[in-house]
């Protein structure tokens, strides 16, 4: 994972409200899906210091991004 992206995601997650952590994780996974396409969910969690169970959420959001983009989402605006 790119060091800059890793730090941006860490910052976003650490500044998310306690009840908004999962939503922020989803948002960051979608935002950087293209850049993170070559890493596994396990690697994602390890690099960010997250529990391995969050890898499932990362994978779901990365897979969902293709459909969201087809519907008009511009991830650069997130």
Specify the residue positions occupied by each region the protein language model found.
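Short Lys/Arg-enriched helix C-cap and helix-to-coil transition segments
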Residues: 62-78
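Internal amphipathic alpha-helical segments of the cytochrome P450 catalytic fold
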Residues: 41-42, 55
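Major-groove recognition helix of helix-turn-helix-like DNA-binding domains
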Residues: 52-66
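Short alpha-helical "recognition helix" segments of helix-turn-helix
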Residues: 42-48
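Amphipathic alpha-helical segments within well-ordered protein domains
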Residues: 30-33, 45
């Amino acid at each position: 994972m790119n060091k800059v992206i890793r730090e941006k995601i860490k910052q976003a997650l650490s500044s998310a409200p306690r009840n908004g952590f999962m939503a922020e994780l989803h948002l960051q996974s979608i935002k950087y899906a293209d850049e993170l396409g070559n890493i596994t969910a396990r690697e994602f969690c390890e690099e960010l210091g997250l529990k391995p169970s969050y890898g499932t959420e990362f994978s779901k959001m990365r897979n969902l991004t293709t459909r969201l983009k087809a519907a008009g989402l511009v991830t650069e605006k997130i």
